[in-house]
Structure formats: structure tokens, C-alpha cells
């Protein structure tokens, strides 16, 4: 009798624990208002600057008007696997090594993408609108500071693609 009472108690306890009702929530598949796909962009070519390096790619400037931000995305090919590659936007055309306007996240050589996030965010709400008249270029450096690749942007080059 002792064994059957114990078995009954275990069964009742198990039923009590596993019979808790849980709500299964359906996933929300709608984007929040103002969220979703970025559709306005300008893309510029990044080319190798040295015969020893065949690093190339694109820099894309995405407009996010609801947040008054510009997202910068860098995608490179043939990057050295084990290196972090610094990225800077400099004033002037390629060859006019003037002052650095700003630096983004480094590119991870293993992926060819920015290391910290897919996008570098520029919070200046006028940056995207002034991009076509911006006198600047982008440089990609190796770990020793040597320029591997560069590309004119803004007034120094026509976008290779835009929307």
C-alpha cells in the first residue's frame, strides 16, 4: 500500500506540474512604423591602390530620414584574414591626403565587413543630403597604416549605384 500511495502521489505531482497552461504567442511579423527596409542610398567604388594588393569593394551610404541618420556600410573583397583594417573618410580627392573627416569601425579582414556593426551611424541629419557635394574620399588601411584601397566619394565621383 505504501508503494502505491507513493506512486499515486508522484503521478499527481507530475500531472500538477506539467498541466500548467502556457500561452503560445504568435510572432509579430510586421515592421514597426518607420522601420523596415532602407531604400535610399548612394554607393561608391573602393579600388586597390597598389599592385601588391587587390582589395576592392564598395561603400554604401544609406539614408534613414525618420531618424535623421546616415548608415555607412563597407564591403570589401580579398582582405587579409587575420587583420583589422582601419577605415577613414578624408577631406579632398584621392591623393590629397588632407585631414581625416572621421573614422568608422575597422573592417574585419575575415569577413570584409565592418567589425562592430553592419553599419556605422552618422547622426548629423544633414550628412546624406550634402553627400553629393562632399569633397572627400575613403581610405582602407592595413595594420601598419599603409593604404590598401581607396575610393572617391561625393563631388569627386559619381555613385556607381543609387536610389
Which residues fall in each region the model found?
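N-terminal, intrinsically disordered, basic low-complexity segments enriched in Arg/Pro/Ser/Thr
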Residues: 11-13
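C-terminal motif of bacterial Sec signal peptides marking the signal peptidase cleavage site
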Residues: 15-19
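N-terminal leader/targeting pre-sequences
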Residues: 21-163
